[in-house]
């Protein structure tokens, strides 16, 4: 069991089940932020050979890699002298598996008792690499924008190695109908053995086109109605934080089971150039370099104005307004209920 108790912030997690609990002064209170981030999202490169048209990082074949030495500096900078380090990291890119020192990065993470997770396009997955990662990884996410992108043999490599596997499905206005089929259970056989499918909100950043952002439509409402459906056999599913305002506004999911955006509140993003920001979509805004500032100077002080602004920025008449941070800080157009 993982635990952290600091003043009016309390957190426990079961690494086996993934169940977490967070509370404030009493069990009914929510803490505003964590004195030590629970998770760090780290881009270990901006190098990727796949060239997806919707890549929000605009990654390409550029050999921009975070060195192992700088990666270790990042991890050690987050190790609070009194309260310890982050519990886990989510490694991204670029494509993490194209980093020449990827396995060493995993080893350095584990050596510090931090759980590594990573997202991949799957191109570089082999039985050998999956065998090397077995027992060392919290979870792997395969990123797709269409079920046609999902190779069953790549899934099998991960599942056969005993690695918890999620699907990250990038949800745009172009694939809402296919997403509805997923929630109707039409792809159950293909998705057999996965842990969950996570729908990621399409962001108009990098190479992604603004015209493909989700809009209020018949397909969108049909998708939300299927979210509420409880009688269909289908894989477990979830959403990224950017979709949460729409869930709170339009669905009937119990809000107690929904976490709003945690960037700069409970999680942090660090890019391959060692810039620290609330999340990977900040595009250089609210960003501070670890080469210029100590991590806890950034976390405890530099992010304060961001937290004040976005703690409750919802301007919509909604019964769950008090639970919602409001629209996306960097791409308000992706929040359909934003006015």
Protein language model annotation of sequence segments:
Residues 31-71, 83, 279-283:
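Canonical Radical SAM [4Fe-4S] cluster-binding loop centered on the CxxxCxxC motif
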Residues 68-92, 99-203:
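Radical SAM/AdoMet-radical enzyme domain recognition
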Residues 1-9, 15-19, 23-25, 38, ...:
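Flexible mid-to-C-terminal extensions adjoining Fe-S/redox cofactors in radical SAM and related proteins
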Residues 13-14, 270:
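Hydrophobic alpha-helical segments, especially N-terminal targeting/anchoring helices
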Residues 38, 85-87, 264, 273:
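Exposed loop/turn and edge beta-strand positions of beta-sandwich/beta-sheet ligand-binding modules
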Residues 51, 93, 272-273:
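Residue-level recognition of short loop/turn positions
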Residues 66-75, 331-339:
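Short cysteine/histidine-rich metal-coordination sites, predominantly Zn2+-binding motifs
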Residues 3, 196-282, 323:
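A C-terminal junction/extension of Radical SAM enzymes
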């Amino acid at each position: 069991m993982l635990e952290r108790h600091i003043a009016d912030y309390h957190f426990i997690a079961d690494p086996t089940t993934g169940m977490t609990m967070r509370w404030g002064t009493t069990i009914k209170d929510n803490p505003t932020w964590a004195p030590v981030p629970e998770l760090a999202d780290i881009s270990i490169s901006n190098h990727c050979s796949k060239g997806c048209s919707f890549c929000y990082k605009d990654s390409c074949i550029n050999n921009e890699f975070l060195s192992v030495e700088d990666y270790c500096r990042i991890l050690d900078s987050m190790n609070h002298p009194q309260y310890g380090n982050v519990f886990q990291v989510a490694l991204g890119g670029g494509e993490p598996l194209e980093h020449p020192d990827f396995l060493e990065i995993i080893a350095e993470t584990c050596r510090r008792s931090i759980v590594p997770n990573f997202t991949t396009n799957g191109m570089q997955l082999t039985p050998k690499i999956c065998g090397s990662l077995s027992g060392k990884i919290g979870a792997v996410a395969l990123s797709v924008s269409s079920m046609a992108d999902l190779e069953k043999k790549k899934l099998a490599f991960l599942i056969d190695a005993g690695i918890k596997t999620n699907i990250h499905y990038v949800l745009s206005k172009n694939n809402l109908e296919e997403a509805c089929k997923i929630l109707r259970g039409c792809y159950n056989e293909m998705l057999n053995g996965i842990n969950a499918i996570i729908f990621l909100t399409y962001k108009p950043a990098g190479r992604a086109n603004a015209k493909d952002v989700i809009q209020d439509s018949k397909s969108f409402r049909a998708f939300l109605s299927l979210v509420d459906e409880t009688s269909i056999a289908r894989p477990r599913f979830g959403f990224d934080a950017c979709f949460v305002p729409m869930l709170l506004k339009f669905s009937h999911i119990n809000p107690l089971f929904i976490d709003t955006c945690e960037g700069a509140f409970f999680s942090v993003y660090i890019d391959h150039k060692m810039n620290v920001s609330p999340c990977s979509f900040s595009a250089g805004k609210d960003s501070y370099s670890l080469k210029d500032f100590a991590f806890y100077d950034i976390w405890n002080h530099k992010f304060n104005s961001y937290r004040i602004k976005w703690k409750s920025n919802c301007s919509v008449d909604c019964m769950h307004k008090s639970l919602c941070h409001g629209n996306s800080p960097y791409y308000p157009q992706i929040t359909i209920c934003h006015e």
